[in-house]
Amino acid sequence: IARATPDGYTIGMGNFAPMAVNKTLFGNLRYDPETDITPIVLIEKGPLVLVVNPSSPYKTVQDIVAAAKAKPGGLTFSSGGIGGSHQLSAELFEQNAGIEMIHVPYKSGSAGLTDLMAGNVTMMFDQMYSAMPSIKADKLRPIAITSKKRSPLLPNVPTFTEVGYPKVEVLNWQGLIAPKG
């Protein structure tokens, strides 16, 4: 999109990582989201949900924190790659809880979820819209969400604020973008 001709017909999806995070993580981007791209409209923004395999012994955030403190580096979290909302949410949780976990990046969020469901990683922060089908099918157990208020989609799942981590608040977002001009 950044290199496309601004013809009024070329549009794409922009989200959290390539539009807001990558510029600070990677010094040699071939585009500048501030000068090469025009935002058109915000389509959605929503919290992430911390999920574990249903056979996991972890049922609460406190369970995870206790296990991580007992064995630093003994728990893993998957993500859809470096610098995205999956990873940054987990890193924010680690920082605020004073724990250390191992990041296992995948080429996509769905690959990270698949390995979580297979029991190969401990947990993942995922967008609610992509985790919900697996939560409803009892293939994932939700632990907490990253919004200020509980979600009507998961009314029995606490927020990180409720369980003592008010700074673990993350909203992922996506919108339509076009080339500048």
Regions found by a protein language model. Give the residues of each.
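Active-site-proximal beta-strand/loop segments in catalytic clefts of secreted hydrolases
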Residues: 14, 80, 105-107, 127-128, ...
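Hydrophobic residues within well-ordered alpha-helices
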Residues: 1-2, 25, 90, 116-117, ...
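Short, hydrophobic alpha-helical packing/hinge segments within bilobed ligand-binding/sensory domains
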Residues: 112-113, 131
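Paired acidic/hydrophobic, glycine-rich loop segments that form the ligand-binding mouth/hinge
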Residues: 8-14, 122-126, 142-144
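Short secondary-structure boundary segments
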Residues: 15-16, 54, 127-129, 147-148, ...
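C-terminal lobe and pocket-closing loops
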Residues: 45, 131-181
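Short, high-confidence coil segments that cap the C-terminus of an alpha-helix
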Residues: 9, 72-73, 116, 121, ...
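Hinge/capping helix and adjacent helix->loop/strand transition within the periplasmic-binding protein
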Residues: 3-9, 24-111, 160-162, 170-181
